[in-house]
Amino acid sequence: MDSLFVPIASFVDKYPLSDKERIAGTGDMSGSVQNTVGGWRLSSDIGCVFIGMEGLIHSYQYVPSEQSKALIEKLIALFERMDLVGIKAQTHASLTAMRGMLRYAALTGDTTLIPKVETRWKLYKEFGMTENYENYNWFGRYDTWTEPCAIIDSYLVATQLWAVTRNPQYLEDADKIYLNGIAATQRANGGFGCDRPVGVVSPDLAIHADEATWCCTMRGGEGLGRAAEYAYFVEADTVYVPFYHESTLALPDRNIALSQHTGYPFGNRVEFIVTEAPKRAVTLALAVPSYLRPDSVQLPSHSDVSAHFVQGFLRVSGHFDAGDTVALNYGFEPRWVPLENRDIADKTLYKAMYGPLVLGYEADAPLELAGKEFSIVADGPDAFRIEGTEFRLTPLYHLLDPAVSSGANYHRMVTVKMDTATVCLE
């Protein structure tokens, strides 16, 4: 900290916040030095100083000092002054700054930082996120590439925002990022690579780089580890299940253990078997996002276990016994969703979704449909078609599919142009 961060303290107020002081449109996947302004050697990864800021905040957690605290707060104030869209900040750097602010809020109790992160998160969703919930590498540079480092950041920020606000919208954001963005960028060898971003410029998902071994594969590993960590949250006597995964949970200090069985986002059931239960009443809170249709709930036969919906969760409460089963049977509806980036002026562009999953299709050019209503029909758990056409839809989600590679010339069309009068949104 003394040699890396302390020397920059006197330069923070000189940090160039104007896009006119930058060389526009430069940078490759690993970044490059642009020019020097006010003592700062500027990177094409605009705002990358905030990646360092998050590391400084992490170190402050273990080695606190007044010097570190003062510098952290100067850097946070600098980030708050930066016009992310105007300066075309790197989205990875911006999201890492948000993670740092959330960590600092937890360390210091300064909850005023949380709504500031929420504002920046909204900006990212509007101008920095692709139509399959990856990222544009920079705000406003829509013809570049995506970066799993930032996609992982976005998953962490969304989940952490839910943890501190309990706003269920953030869980929906995280679910879609994990199943579409993170899953789409993991390659057959387990590494992570960059894609061509779907949305403002490109109508299709394609490979930009098979693997970014120098950064994204490492961050991808962290993302998968965090997905396991985020499978369950515990607060007092409530076990939250914000995301569904085949998994087990053991809390020896609370005398709680259970196993979870599901094919989510495929299939139609998530089941929990209690293998150890305390003598006190506890609550199992199961996520019910807005795109999930809760068809039925299976509860233990004894009468003191009840279920009710609260703030995006099905809360199952009562005294459980070892061997009890709780299950949620669910369904999804295929639907057309308007493209979400605010810089997309054409309001006749849509994407197909099934629950949290973005669907794509094989074609050389984006579809243009007009003249009648075009519904999406499910032919199976991962097979769909646009009624009245020959076009088949499949999820962009995949699990280590070797076909997702530049060598296989992988690409999937996502956007569809339709007369709004012919769109069946549900």
Enumerate the language-model features and the residues they cover.
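Extended ligand-binding groove/face enriched in aromatic
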Residues: 1-77
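Surface-exposed loops/turns
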Residues: 278, 321-322
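Aromatic (Trp/Tyr) and acidic
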Residues: 32-64, 91-123, 138-288, 296
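C-terminal beta-rich recognition modules with glycine/proline-rich loops and embedded aromatic residues
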Residues: 117, 171-273, 309, 318, ...
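Short beta-strand segments within Ig-like beta-sandwich modules, predominantly Fibronectin type-III
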Residues: 304-310
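Long, well-ordered core segments of solenoidal/helical folds
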Residues: 1-20, 66-87, 112-133, 175-188
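Short, surface-exposed beta-strand/beta-hairpin micro-motifs centered on an aromatic residue
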Residues: 313-315
